[in-house]
Amino acid sequence: MCGFIASFGQNINHKGLKIAFNQLQRRGPDAEGIWKKDNIFLGSRRLAIFDLHDRSNQPMTSICNRYVLVFNGSIYNYLELRNYLLNLGIKLRTTSDTEVIIELFVLEGPKMLSRLQGMFSF
């Protein structure tokens, strides 16, 4: 099971976040990633299940570079959703469920949540 941490606001405690992030190490032994911008911090520890390549590490940025996602869980219908995106001509870079989620969000916004079947958090 992966693990992630997120923080945003005026007074981000970077020392505290680093301690918390390190506590997640056992949750994701395959990769770790951090994304910071202004007053936003996202960190991810990955247990690779789908697409074992580095290209699927998190935090993941959307193709348009507007959105960044950290995700944990399993989307049971992600192959169906992936095919939907491909049929629309979206050129996915990975075979990961994470990219399917973020690109579906780019396309449909929050209403895409009703299309996800599984157990997940992001």
Where are the regions a protein language model picked out?
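N-terminus-centric sequence/structural signature that marks the extreme N-terminus
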Residues: 1-122
